[in-house]
């Protein structure tokens, strides 16, 4: 016979938590699951309850194992009214308490960092969740930039509520090119064109594994010479303000080096050009491409910008993404530290490099200071590096196979009490569509993500 958790029990849990009683002891004393205690603990930690009480009830099956209790609640979710303080970004309804769950990425709230990681198999609701989250961010005046590799965020297939409330702007970079120059110098380039040359060569080397030490050196020198020919010289800082050449100029520079019979490195130059030639075939970075100004993005006051990359060759997708992120980093660092301004949403994380020195790694480590957050999404835990796992304060885990229990172990190590490793493992492999196991503030809880159409009345 199932029994309902009374308001008195909920208040008792909160009182015992404030007195420092361990979650396991509270659960045993009150006859509830440690997961339910952990869910309430998360809200207490985030200051989510007002002085009133939480109006909700949920079932407790006395004879079932904890993991069965968790999963059985998934089938009993009904809309509940909550008195929870409306702070942060609404995610959805907590299946163990009935309260609304919020993600609070804002540094002023004490968040470790604003970054979030989303993982789950195909068809479990990742795209819909991202749409809901960025639309919610837009209502708070926070802009988002989505890098779309598979047209999952195409406006042709977007729900009308997304079009109305997210006010999306679509940029067809793969089809029309984009008016951004990877040779642009930024204030953090303290060595001017030398920094630009190193950045370009490093990016190509990360993406094209065939580029070795010699090819890297030739590529770097080619960029330095190209910038010098455009009157941007390392030894003269006044020239660093000059307009840089457009990216296709690098192709001409490498061709000249490879055709110069007196150049001892002509074969290396030809080899480099053969590896990166696809970049120039598509000519994505061009003066006549679609205009994207980061200043306009930062000042848009609640919009979603979608950069369409579908149709580009796989390696070129990575190159374009890295150069765009470096350009974005240059802009945000030029205006200095500040409050949270925007999020970069990177789907299909297997297309990204998390190596030391990559733009993604830099944003994960330093984005908080400059007011930019990352939302990383992919189908498999293996697509994320240890840097990504350790530098994303919030994780949304949808149904995932987790055959080697890698993600279950990583999650259980981060939690303070609450669900056990076995509960987590069983739960994340059986979650229904649209339901995620969320890890934040060292607490794990299960949330039914609220779709855009079900949020409108709260805006």
Segments and roles (model prediction):
Residues 62-84, 419-459:
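Phosphate-binding and hydrolysis-coupling loops of NTP-dependent motor/remodeling domains
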Residues 102-134, 310-423, 453:
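Conserved P-loop NTPase motor cores
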Residues 26-27:
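Short alpha-helical "recognition helix" segments of helix-turn-helix
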Residues 5-21:
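Short, amphipathic alpha-helical "recognition" segments used to contact nucleic acids or chromatin
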Residues 96, 132-372, 427-442:
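P-loop NTPase motor domains
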Residues 4, 35-60:
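Short, solvent-exposed alpha-helical "recognition" segments
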Residues 51-124, 128-135, 395:
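Basic- and hydrophobic-enriched, low-structure N-terminal and domain-boundary segments
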């Amino acid at each position: 016979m199932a029994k309902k958790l009374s308001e008195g029990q909920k208040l008792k849990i909160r009182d015992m938590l404030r007195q420092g009683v361990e979650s396991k002891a509270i659960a045993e004393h009150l006859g509830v699951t440690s997961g339910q205690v952990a869910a309430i603990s998360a809200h207490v930690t985030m200051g989510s309850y007002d002085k009133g009480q939480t109006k909700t009830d949920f079932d407790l099956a006395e004879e079932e194992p904890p993991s069965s209790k968790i999963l059985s609640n998934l089938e009993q979710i009904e809309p509940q009214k909550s008195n929870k303080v409306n702070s942060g970004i609404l995610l959805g309804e907590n299946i163990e308490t009935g309260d609304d769950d919020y993600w609070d990425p804002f540094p002023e709230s004490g968040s470790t960092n604003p970054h979030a990681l989303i993982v789950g198999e195909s068809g479990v609701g990742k795209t819909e969740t991202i749409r809901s989250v960025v639309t919610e961010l837009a209502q708070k005046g926070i802009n988002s930039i989505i890098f779309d590799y598979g047209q999952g965020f195409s406006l042709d297939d977007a729900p009308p509520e997304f079009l109305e409330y997210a006010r999306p702007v679509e940029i067809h970079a793969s089809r029309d090119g984009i008016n951004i120059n990877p040779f642009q110098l930024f204030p953090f380039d303290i060595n001017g064109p030398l920094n630009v040359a190193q950045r370009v060569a490093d990016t190509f080397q990360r993406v094209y594994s065939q580029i070795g030490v010699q090819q890297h050196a030739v590529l770097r020198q080619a960029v330095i010479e190209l910038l010098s020919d455009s009157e941007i010289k390392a030894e003269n800082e006044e020239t660093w303000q000059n307009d840089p050449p457009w990216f296709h100029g690098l192709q001409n520079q490498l061709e000249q080096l490879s055709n110069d019979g007196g150049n001892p490195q002509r074969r290396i130059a030809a080899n480099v050009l053969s590896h990166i030639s696809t970049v120039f075939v598509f000519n994505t970075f061009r003066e006549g491409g679609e205009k994207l100004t980061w200043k306009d993005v930062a000042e848009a006051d609640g919009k979603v910008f979608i950069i369409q990359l579908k149709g580009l060759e796989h390696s070129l997708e990575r190159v374009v993404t890295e150069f765009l992120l470096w350009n974005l980093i240059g802009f945000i660092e030029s205006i200095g530290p500040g409050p949270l301004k925007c999020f970069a949403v990177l789907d299909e994380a297997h297309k990204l490099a998390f190596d030391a020195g990559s733009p993604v790694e830099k944003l994960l480590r330093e984005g908080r200071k400059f007011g930019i957050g990352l939302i990383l999404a992919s189908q498999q835990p293996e697509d994320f590096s240890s840097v990504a796992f350790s530098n994303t304060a919030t994780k949304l885990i949808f149904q995932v196979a987790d055959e080697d229990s890698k993600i279950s172990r990583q999650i259980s190590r981060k939690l303070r009490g609450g669900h056990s490793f076995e509960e987590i493992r069983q739960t994340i492999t059986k979650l229904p569509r649209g339901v995620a196991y969320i890890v934040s503030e060292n607490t794990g809880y299960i949330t039914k993500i609220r779709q855009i159409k079900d949020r409108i009345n709260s805006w």
